[in-house]
Amino acid sequence: MSSRYRTLLGHLLLAVGSTAGFVLLIELAAKVAGLPLGAPLLPDSRNCLQRSSLLSMEFRPHCHGALSFAAFDTNDLGLRSPEVRDDGSRRILAIGDSCTWGWAVPQDGSYPAVLQRLLDQRSDGTRYQVINAGTPGYTSYHGLQYLRERGLALHPFILILGYGFNDATTDGDVEEQLAAERRLLPVMLVDDFLFLHSRAYAFARRHSMAARRDPRQRVDPARFGQHLEEMITLARADGVHTMALSFSATQQGPYGEALASVATQLAIPVVTYQGPRFDVVHPTAEGYGALAALILERLEHEGWVE
């Protein structure tokens, strides 16, 4: 090796060593200062979340975790649901946000789980399989992507839509965010690792995000209506019956109007939940049970459940 290359290599090693030492010094200072590590997107669920090029974040298959005071388990599809059976039963696919997933209730307390028990108690001989494909934080845009790429592949007989609250939250346009994440997925994975393991990086990222928070709604009311219409149209093309859920506490104003307009235009039933809530958004355990009963009543009224 020539003296020139030895000199360059020495300079490179010196630069790397100096940078590493500087980073370690900053990290030590952050630890002494008591700065916390970054928290996962959903607290207590760090080991069960993974990046997704389709949906940004999703739950890992076969994972046991805890979220909002309640334990959960995922099946081989990463859903909070029993394993999907191929036994000829009629499948009811419930897609939505945390109100579908079952926020703050045990595994058997979500409305899809309660609906399954109510259907199992019937004696007409028809077998039904309710699949809980809800995910906390998801918007109607996530629902459309999921239905198109995965949901319809499950061959549901009935589809239940439950979106709206997360669409209305202000954190920037979700379609733009997902497009950027797809382009930069390796960078996002490194970002996640550093956020969860470096106090200095977590501190810098928090302040950076706060300074550039996007005030736009994740999905505006017009596109919310378009997403609903696209999901219903996709389902109908496959011969799937569709209904929608409305949570009156979170779907007043333009989002509720968009849902009502699409429901009228495409003639789909809407079940409105007005029962007790755990917080501003989510039903209580008793509320999920009442919602499941309302859904079953409407399914019977439509003639979709015999």
Regions picked out by a protein language model, each given a short descriptive name:
Residues 14, 279-306:
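Histidine-centered active-site loop/cap adjacent to the catalytic His
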Residues 91-95, 131, 159-161:
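Conserved beta-strand elements of the Class I
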Residues 164-261, 265-281, 296:
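Serine-dependent acyl-ester chemistry module
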Residues 126-144, 149:
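A conserved hydrophobic secondary-structure block that centers on an alpha-helix together
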Residues 13-29:
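Hydrophobic membrane-insertion alpha-helices, especially the h-region
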Residues 33-118, 122-123:
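Membrane/wall-proximal cationic-aromatic binding patches
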Residues 151, 155-160:
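Proline-aspartate-enriched helix->loop->beta-strand connector
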Residues 140, 144, 221, 225, ...:
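Short, amphipathic alpha-helical "lid/cap" segments that border enzyme active or binding sites
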